[in-house]
Amino acid sequence: MQATLKTPLARLGQLAALALLTASLGPLATAQTATEELKLPNLGDASTSMFSAEFEHQLGRAWLRSFRSQVRTVDDPLLFDYLENLTYRLVSHSQLSDRRIELVVVDNPTINAFAVPGGVIGVHNGLLMYAQSEDELATVLAHEIAHLSQRHFSRGVEYQKSQTPINLAALLAGMVIMATAGGDAGMAAISASQALAQNNALRYSRSNEAEADRIGMQTLVDAGMDPYAAPAMFERMLQSQRFTSAERIPEFLRTHPLSENRIADTRNRARTYPKAIHPDNLEYQLMRARVINQLAATPEQAVQRFRGELAGTSRSTEAARYGLVLALTNAGRADEAALELDSIWSGDRDRIEYVIADAEIDILRDRPERAAEKLARQLKLTPGNHPLTMEYARALTRNQQAHIAEEVLTEQSKRRPNDPGLWYELAEVQGLSGNIIGLHQSRAEYFILNGYLDEAQKQLSYARRLVKNDFPTTARIDQRLADIVAMREQMESF
């Protein structure tokens, strides 16, 4: 589903670019242009509720809608489910008081993770290419969670506002472009509009970084993970920076600068904790295999990579073979994929990754009814499991059972109402089952979550005209139309 960027927040990335282009005209002109273009509210001084937890929550959700409209996100329920579970595991051991977390996974090969006020945590899938273990990945996530728990954004803006007036439009624009085009570009947008190139509003200060390092490591340890993973991951990041030209330094390192001293401090801090054995996590290695497939130029390239790993040395032979199964499936080579899967599946028949891989092979072989039966049995063991549910709906749809797939996804949407991919798939199966009113409603939810409020309003209006003598449905549609109006008003009265 395509849509134009019409809502105010969905244009933030364009405005950030505008800020860069007009910087030579003077920072005050840039700030004025951004504010007028966005029609963002005057938030008052730093003593107002703009820094309350609830304000940050609303700001973060508005930002997320904008962000989704401008980046390519990963549509992989297995990977998302894994990262979401890991994030919540860390959050449960953190100092974060408001635990309403929203995760976004960006399809980008670079090293990057970011946290946005209000509990939005973003991860580039490329980060898993660099993190060799789950603990190393968790190091980065725990660091970002620490920035949230210590409210470094609000504290930074408080300080910045005491030096010069803050323009929220420029801050949000910089946040969008910093998480997409790179840290320097985002900071340039912010700095130009604030006339404070020397005081980057969103670049974490050294004291904030040290605080996030310390608190993040404590979160890591409290979650039962390896503190030595932190210096190992930071060292790997620093090494990647040394062999990279200045303009290609990963985004995370632009906004979270590393040094030998900082790594040494992290290593010394890790030594203060008792040593323990931390075995590698197979599930993480399986997720890395999925990411390698996602980022490969072609399925055949992935096939060759995994065959090479199996012929040489691999951190996890089982994960490498699983990656080969996925690559062969993507290449349409079902028989070869099935043989490779059989060699690793026998010892763990209930592992969800393998159950779904088997179902995908069945679907590729044009046996969707068999896939649906297997997935239904597995769902009885783990009711509501998101990756299994999404694959089950896919198998049902391929088996000409769109009406049942609609029922399955409708129930799942009640559990995960903020999942854009789920609403997209639900709209597709509703179209196939002939539920046109439902199709428009689901498309509206998809557009709302992606920041396209005008498109969402159109879809709801289409649905409203089709409803005949159904008061409950009419009432639900009217309520969502009112919600869209409220979202627009919120932009002007935060």
What kind of feature is each model-predicted range?
Residues 165-181, 188-200:
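Membrane-active amphipathic alpha-helices enriched in small hydrophobic residues
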Residues 32, 43-50, 61, 73, ...:
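Extracytoplasmic and endomembrane cell-envelope/extracellular-matrix remodeling and assembly machinery
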Residues 70-80, 93-103, 157-160, 185-188, ...:
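Surface-exposed patches in mature extracellular/periplasmic domains of secreted proteins
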Residues 125-139, 202, 207:
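Short pre-active-site segment immediately N-terminal to the catalytic Zn-binding motif
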Residues 135, 145-162, 180:
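Catalytic Zn2+-binding segment of zinc metalloproteases
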Residues 123, 139-147, 151, 212:
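Active-site recognition of the HExxH zinc-binding catalytic motif
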Residues 2-9, 16-114, 198, 242, ...:
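Hydrophobic or amphipathic, alpha-helical segments that drive membrane association/targeting
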